[in-house]
UniProtKB/Swiss-Prot annotation:
GO molecular-function terms, A-Z: 4-hydroxy-tetrahydrodipicolinate reductase; glyceraldehyde-3-phosphate dehydrogenase (NAD+) (phosphorylating) activity; glyceraldehyde-3-phosphate dehydrogenase (NADP+) (phosphorylating) activity; NAD binding; NADP binding
Binding partners and assembly: Homotetramer.
Pathway(s): Carbohydrate degradation; glycolysis; pyruvate from D-glyceraldehyde 3-phosphate: step 1/5
Record-given protein name: Glyceraldehyde-3-phosphate dehydrogenase
Gene (name only): gap
Length: 335
């Protein structure tokens, strides 16, 4: 089998996870990753055997740090069939001309606007729409988590409306520059938040409104979800629908917080204590007439990683069936 050649531009929080997940597949391989500075992540990438690429202007800094380079970022892009752009939000747009010049396919993350790629992706919701595409945006962690629960409910019961309050982690565990440390911040204060329109980039017919706030934690996001459906249902019906989704995990056995979820991931031996699944508390599923409520936690560092692998597979036309790709990705990474 000829493997798809994948480059990761930006070996940071998402990029390093995507690289490892791609490398675990049998139909794609990493041909290079990029860093702009010779920090510890660059050193670890080299230690793990990844070919490392950097801007030509920074090659001297890498040489001084004793971290060998395989070439420039432009040279990495030229070698790839597809580039996963994991650079910080807003920077990816500036890279688009480089990808177009090289004639390679590109995936951006949810920090970029939908218009950049013209197609926003969630594996369960619209896999087939990404088949053969040159440009795709994998939606953000929060949007991914919401698509995963809205789509199967809509398919079986029909969704009339969705209302979500998102308690967002302030920043990632390794980020010492952001906050808050001792505050709760409505973000944005002017409602609704951007998450509803982002859901519509994948599921345009869904009536959804969202409100978000930042809280002083780094572990996970927490969603309070309210859905109104078109069909009579029970909590058991909702439980059954969620149970059919391989990327939804029910929290039980005394797990009552995001801290315990992360500890569970550690105890399971997950790499970087990643929890790729939506984490739903089944006891929170409460039905009143045709409305129901529940809590779910979202691990922002990892939830988009399997989605990105599926996006690669669709764009490279390695698998035409979304369900089969999801199964293949899950098995390879240990989900």
């Amino acid at each position: 089998m000829v493997k798809a050649k994948i480059a990761v531009n930006g070996y940071g929080t998402i990029g390093k996870r995507v690289a490892d997940a791609v490398q675990a597949q049998d139909d794609m391989e990493i041909i290079g990753v990029s860093k702009t500075k010779p920090n510890y992540e660059a050193a670890v990438a080299h230690q793990k055997g990844y070919d490392l690429f950097a801007p030509a202007s920074n090659s001297g800094a890498f040489e001084k740090a004793g971290i060998p380079l395989a070439g420039t970022i432009e040279e990495m892009v030229e070698k790839a069939d597809l580039v996963v752009d994991c650079t910080p939000g807003g920077i990816g747009e500036a890279n688009k001309p480089m990808y177009e010049k090289a004639g390679v396919k590109a995936i951006w993350q949810g920090g970029e606007d939908h218009e950049l790629a013209g197609f926003s992706f969630n594996a369960a919701s619209n896999y087939e729409g990404a088949l053969g595409r040159d440009l795709v945006r994998v939606v953000s962690c929060n949007t991914t988590g919401l698509c995963r629960v809205i789509y199967p409910i809509d398919r079986e019961l029909g969704v009339k409306k969705v209302r979500v309050t998102l308690a967002r982690r302030a920043t990632d565990p390794n980020d010492i520059k952001k906050g808050p440390i001792n505050a709760i911040v409505p973000d944005p204060i002017k409602l609704p938040s951007h998450h509803g329109p982002d859901i519509k980039s994948v599921l345009p017919h869904i009536n959804i409104t969202t409100a978000a706030l930042k809280i002083p934690t780094t572990l996970m996001h927490l969603h309070t979800v309210n859905m109104e459906v078109n069909t009579d249902c029970t909590a058991e019906d909702i439980n059954r629908i969620f149970s059919s989704q391989s990327r939804i995990r029910f929290m039980s056995q005394g797990i009552n917080s995001t801290a315990e979820i992360i500890e569970l991931a550690r105890d399971m031996g997950r790499p970087r204590n990643d929890m790729w699944e939506n984490c739903i508390w089944p006891e929170s599923i409460t039905v009143h007439e045709r409305e129901f409520y529940f809590f779910q936690a979202i691990h922002q560092e990892s939830i988009v990683v399997p989605e990105t692998v599926d996006a690669i597979r669709a764009m490279m036309e390695l698998e035409s069936d979304g369900a089969k790709s999801i199964q293949k990705t899950n098995k390879a990474i240990g989900l």
